[in-house]
Amino acid sequence: MLIEVERQDDVCVLRLQGRLVTGADPAYLLAKTDEIKSQNCDKVLADLRELLSIGSTGIGFLVGIYTSVTKSPGRRFVLVGPRRRVREVLDLTHLSSVIPVVSDIASGLAALRAEGPAAQSAGEGSSVL
């Protein structure tokens, strides 16, 4: 499991790679959560294209970041490009009906940069996968 955090202009990009499942190092996940929070980003894009599998630990990590990011008005979080197996877990847990899921980076950036409160809900639960 590898989680990279980088800032690209007004967006924090999280790149998740490998397997985010039970047994993942809790200290590592806490450190990454703190790193993301310290960036104080209003817009966060989680790139899941290289995430091979996700379990309850990974779902908990994503929910924690989502909750932290979106607790203030106007802040947005989007998931990008989950593989079929990861998408199935997002659907099974209904996380994909809460957090917008899009197929590619360009769509994710467009969703994050759209104006107004309707912009976030426009992608919620929808998918172009």
Regions found by a protein language model. Give the residues of each.
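Active-site donor-binding loop signature of nucleotide-sugar glycosyltransferases
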Residues: 16-18, 104
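A charged, well-structured terminal subsegment
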Residues: 100-129
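Conserved catalytic submotifs in the C-terminal HATPase_c
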Residues: 8, 49, 106
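Amphipathic alpha-helical interaction surfaces in cytosolic regulatory modules
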Residues: 20-99
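Short beta-strand/loop segment at the start of cytosolic alpha/beta domains
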Residues: 1-15, 128
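General small-molecule cofactor/ligand-binding pocket signal
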Residues: 6, 80, 102
